[in-house]
Amino acid sequence: MIKVRVPATSANMGPGFDSMGMAVKVYNEFAFREINNGLNFNGVPEEFCNEDNIIYKAMKYCFDKADYKIKGLNISVLNQDIPISRGLGSSSSCIVGGLVGANEILGGKFSKDELLEMAVKIEGHPDNVAPALFGGMVVAIIENNKTVYNKIEIKDKVKFITIVPDFRLSTEKARTVLPKQISRADGIYNIGRAALMISCFVTDRYDLIRSACNDALHQNYRKELIPHFDDVYNKCYELGALGCYLSGAGPTIMAIIDNGANGFSNNIKQYLKDKDIKWGVLELQADNKGAFVIKGDS
């Protein structure tokens, strides 16, 4: 049996729409085994126990690339700790987990870069799948049908308070509210802030992250789909967050705080309780490792 662990990811990071993302330490864990025939699932809701399952589709994509005809397959979801449809890369974790598992069955035929190309073909953009695969903060673009990326290790000087609403928001729905065209001014606004965001993590200038987190392309439109967004977002800054942004397509809000700052999580939890906002709060560190096969299990 092959076991694979994949981290959650937070895409866009404010201004880096569809091009920036980072991995954090909450995980989905999968197990795969080739069997004599059939397709079996464990730990998967019944409606997803078929060939349309995103994990299976990713694995089949990898097998097809290798011209490998698998006899049968057992897919198990051992742990699903990444919240679903909350802007934390749950679907990307399934894609990456399936690809890494399939590649292990193939004996490691493909490199991680090749797996990334497959993941991007399946997902459509690299901002979640790249950090899920490589860990850290990844900046990625598509150039001539090839994914060009660079990984930045996130130091332990900051941590990430993940404020998770009690409702789902699909990426498809969140994209419907975005304008089809943007102004030059908004493009310039985001280019500068995306560059600043990257430089903040490279040079440890976390005091500049608040300005770097601002966005003109998606957040102001998507927040209308999220009750209490402005109140919680503003409260994060009031409580001392270094930066705050909508994670992925939402609805999760990500607050960046100093690693030595104590009390933020309890304070935001108390605020949510006082306002009767039934959202969860996770205090997470960055994951710089990315997806990996768990060794020593059978």
From Swiss-Prot:
This is Homoserine kinase. It is found in: Cytoplasm. It comes from the Bacteria. Belongs to the GHMP kinase family. Homoserine kinase subfamily. Pathway: Amino-acid biosynthesis; L-threonine biosynthesis; L-threonine from L-aspartate: step 4/5. It comes from Clostridium botulinum (strain Eklund 17B / Type B). PANTHER family: HOMOSERINE KINASE, HOMOSERINE/4-DIPHOSPHOCYTIDYL-2-C-METHYL-D-ERYTHRITOL KINASE. ATP binds at residues 83-93. It catalyses: L-homoserine + ATP = O-phospho-L-homoserine + ADP + H(+). It is an enzyme of class 2 (transferase). GO terms for cellular component: cytoplasm. GO terms for molecular function: ATP binding; homoserine kinase activity.
